């Protein structure tokens, strides 16, 4: 268990929320070693969803960007029996498929704290590791990319970075 604080800023009629945790977010640089980065962004993703009921904020859509927030659609599935989260949709945007948030399967399982059901080859498991972006792609309601041509390219073996099969299977939700 880690401390999780939230700060807010009101500017030009829009409220911005910031997740606080000194262990994960007080370092000299935003990215460090992959295992720490995976842990940090899993913590952030879980915090985002956990804070929504506390804030009384129920979005229609949560827009996730790259592997750093790809655990959100996975966690949202684990909350499916909670009426607060019913009907919330997710969009997963991929900017660069090369960066996937891959790390040790047991390390990711431990950090996420969810059941083995989510760690199979059609979900988070990826060649005996875990892949956060793969999980986000598997569970997001819609998948977007930086361009229509990139959406096509990543569905090929040449540019699909090992995920072209899943992306092709999700092609009806990919743009």
Segment roles from a protein language model:
Residues 1-175:
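Catalytic cores of nucleotide-sugar-dependent glycosyltransferases that transfer UDP/GDP/TDP-activated
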